[in-house]
Each structure stands twice: as structure tokens, then as C-alpha cells.
Amino acid sequence: MKTIRIVVMSLVTAILVGCGTTSTVPITGRKQTLLVSDGEVLSLSTQQYKQYMQSAKASTNATNTAMVKRVGQNLANAVSTYLTNNGLSAELQNYQWEFNLVQDNQVNAWCMPGGKIVVYEGILPITKDEASLAIVLGHEIAHAVAKHSAERLSNEYKNQYGTAILGAVVQGAGVSEKTQALISLGQQLGGALWTSGFSRKQESEADHMGLIFAAMAGYDPQVAVSFWQRMSQLSGNKPAEFLSDHPSDATRIRQIQGWMPEALKYYKPAKSATMTTTGKTLKISSKKTSTKKKTTTKKK
């Protein structure tokens, strides 16, 4: 019976893989098999992103909000340039970048497929400056570019619905079964499908790619080591949400140091007047700012 089950599951896997597509992760070159299309993933994630943003409270700190959007856009521009220069411009249609800062004391940030990024105010005292924030955002952007959510959904889909899909294939069922299965699986996993639960391999890959993206955008990648050291000191005996599925602190820092020579090849501090913020270390604002202008009276 056990042998029969192994044979059946092997057949299921073969059929599912045959129905999927093989893609290459940018920068790392890792091969991955995806059983779901970009359209299917975006359809599921967009709905859950809208639901989250309807209940979330946007930050009232105008300075920090502007910083998150500025750093995020610099990174998005760097990613777009990289993809275009490497013959991957078709991928750009999958990203409509949005960068949000929300009122939440958790030390966390996440990115949904399609480039919907949320940063919690609680992580800013740890990032301390724009360069470290770029490391965080680069990591989250990397999850989207590497299609980690689609990869995870493919694995969950294969594990939970393999036998059912095999039956559907044998009976000549249409595509609707797959669509219904995806919707059901997405509902079961909820927002966690897009914002947590990545494998250690995926987290390390996001560290690697994020480091490169930050350097491409003009941020010093060397700040990554001190940032992750601060994160490890913060967690103590209770890992922060942001670190719950990540490699150990020692492993992460060792890996980052190993990737540093590669990252530094891409690093060119911004020199133009229009991008002076990307190469500098700017402190995080701890005060709520107002958009109202102050009026001054000149002394006669």
C-alpha cells in the first residue's frame, strides 16, 4: 500500500510539474517550478491587500511616510532598470508598486505579489536611517521579484490538492477545478500566504537579492550587517515577527558578509542633486509632522 501511494504521488507530482512553468530567479539564477500563473496570484493577493488597507491606519508622520515612499520608489526604479537591462522587461507588467507606512508598533514589513508593500512604524527605530530602511524594503521587494508567494502557493497546491487534481485530469475536467482549488487554498491560508511562512531558502535568497537591489539604488549595502545585528539584539528570547521564519542571526550575517563583494560592485552613491537622499544616512523622524506652513514675520 505504501509503495502504491508513493507511485501515485510521484505521478501526481509529474503531472502537476508538467502543467507548470519553469522560471529562473533573477540575480541568484535558481530554477523554480510554478503551478500558478502571475494572473492567478495577483488576483488572490490584490483582494487581500485591499481588505488589509481598509482596516489599517496610515501613519500620520508625514516625514517618515515620505521617506518610505521615496526609498521604496528608488528601489523600484533600480529593479525596473535591472529587469529591463537583462531582457526581463515583460515582468514589469506584474508590478504596480505601492509603499505604505501604517500605525503599528510591531517590528515588521511585508510585500505582496505585484509590489504592494507595507511598513510598520515599529520597525523604524531599528532601521534608524534610509540605508537600513533600503535593506528592509529591498528584502521585501525581492520576495515579489523572486515570486516566492507563487512558489509557496504552488507547493501548498501540490501538497493539498495533488490527488484531487489528478482525478480531475483523469476525468478530463476543465480548468475551473484548479481555479476553485486556488481560491479555497488562498482563503485557508489568508494573508499569511503573502506576508510570512517563507522557507529559509527563500528568506536567504531575499537577503541576497535585497542587498543587491539596495546597492543598485545607491544605498550603502554595508549597513546591512549592523542592521541585522540590531534586529537580533531586539528579539532576545522572543523572535520578532519579521524574523520568525528567517535564518539564524549568525547564519544571516555570515551570508550577508559573503555576498558583500558582489553587492559593492553595484554600489554607486547617488551624486545628482535630484537623488541626494539615496546616498546619505538620514535619521528617522520621531515626531509627527504637519503639512501646514509656518508664517514668519520679518523684523524691520
Language-model segments: which ranges?
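A Zn2+-metalloprotease active-site environment signal
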Residues: 2-6, 19-300
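Internal catalytic-core helix/loop-beta-alpha segment
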Residues: 9
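C-terminal motif of bacterial Sec signal peptides marking the signal peptidase cleavage site
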Residues: 14-18
